[in-house]
């Protein structure tokens, strides 16, 4: 009996990633017997195998589970789900739905462009079609360069909003392509405009996808996450291609039917994109999320967790905040005299200078050479608090008194309010920062829009603020 018990007792165990562990015991003949326990999401199984036996052998449900295992290794990053962010699966599912709808819409648009170029028309000129194609491509290339220069530095700050904007712009571009053959005189201009929009989509969509991939990769596995995302998109596009082969012959001769299909697919595309972007839970603060978290903190004394703040973050209106907050501006934009400089630095030793224009609701911040991420976060918090003084809503006692001063005082005494809020922040900000860290926010980095200007001034602190 003792020998039998010792044979059945596990000698060792092994585990792959987050899967269920399996144990090993000694067989009667002295060989090792492994309990095969594997978990594929909601699937699990256990059986006995000896060294040299193929774990994927056999038919029936085990073969099906082996197929699922193969698909998992092909389409999902290694170590899933531990190697990616918690929002990965929900985001990728909705992203696949939108990619499928976009693939079908793209097929309708491509067919319309080819018809407009004269494919299938014996009277069409090859040189005219070539000229149209060259004009279309050159317009898009110029647009790509200009947009990357104009908005490239802002894409990280509002990745979710720009991702949604890119997909809506892509739908608009495809609509123009579908309508282009109806107006042959304006065909070249229409398809050029469409390609310009698509090139902007390529810049905005590609850049924001890279930013989101950085968020999803939790084991420095950005390349693996990106590669598997590309594989998923390829599978979806292949499915879209097969469906398009069945759909196009049915709608090619009827413009109204093509438009009807396009409208339905566009509605699905936008909805799936919204759900995908809304599923994201980013743990870094941009201006919108910081404003939401700060407002909740001032009103209730609690810091919102990333999941709650991301659900409340505006996706459609994030481009037009009520307060104009500029971080990292040149010092000469803030002061023009020695007296103004003394007013700004009086009463505080923080490595930033802040100027508030009440009439325009504009806050400009000059940063010191020693300003680090937490300094930038404090400066942004300072600016948002000044903006809150011009709004309604509950505020802590000291800030409520300052709001009364704002409503009663002259607009040209803003520097006094800036100095007073510095003193309030000396007590308030450490509590706020500690609450952010406890709630799960990453305060060692941020996605606030900061320009490259830095300055020094007489009362700048010597100690570097991290």
From Swiss-Prot:
Annotated localization: Membrane
Taxonomic classification: Eukaryota, Metazoa, Chordata, Craniata, Vertebrata
Topology of this chain in the membrane: Single-pass membrane protein
Keyword Acetylation among UniProt keywords: yes
Domain of life: Eukaryota
Leader sequence residues: none
Protein name: RUS family member 1
Annotated transmembrane regions: 245-265
Family: Belongs to the RUS1 family.
Keywords from the UniProt entry: Acetylation, Membrane, Transmembrane, Transmembrane helix
CC per GO annotation: membrane
Origin species: Rattus norvegicus
Primary subcellular site in the record, as a coarse category: membrane
N-acetylalanine modification, residue list: 2
